[in-house]
Amino acid sequence: MLMNSAARPMLLFRALARRSASSQAYTDALAHLKQDLKKAMLAKDDTKKTTIRSLLATIKNKEIDSRDKPLDHFALHDIYSKLVAQRRESIDGFLKNGRDDLVQKEQLEMQLIQAYMAALPVASAEELAARADAFLHELKSTHGALPLPKVFAQVSWPTVAQDWNASPAAVRSALAAAFKKSS
């Protein structure tokens, strides 16, 4: 489908507006990825180059999918977490099939993604678990034993990203894990 010349600038403006509405940490992380891609290309490091290209493609697809909603570093952390989980599943499959060469490649990619994930200014899994435990302990002392849906109802979801320094999905999973552990 061909686009008329008047529509092209509007699409470019929307993409720039979305990216400028993103958090500074998100913008810095993308710039760092692009800079590392250039370095990997110059160093002819194929593993790093393909991994970074994969990251950038996944991020771009997420930007396209979430059209009008600007992404932030929490969304980037969720993307990285999903990619690390995919690598872990691939490693398990390759180990079952005796493909040690592919296991090593996937492990290198996973370590690289984890390094980028660690550079993001978000709460670690340990910090989230401690915060979730404290939150549940406080709820039990004030309201008694509550079922998980009522625990979720006590969370201030509009401000959870800033309060907990994590994405709502990460907070939800940390609370569920802490609830399961305490039950």
UniProtKB/Swiss-Prot annotation:
GO terms for molecular function: carbon-nitrogen ligase activity, with glutamine as amido-N-donor. Keywords: Mitochondrion, Transit peptide. The keyword Nuclease does not apply. InterPro entries: Asn/Gln_tRNA_amidoTrase-B-like, YqeY/Aim41, YqeY/Aim41_N. One of its GO terms (cellular component) is mitochondrion. Residues 1-20 form a transit peptide. It is found in: Mitochondrion. This is Altered inheritance of mitochondria protein 41, mitochondrial. Belongs to the AIM41 family. Its main location: mitochondrion.
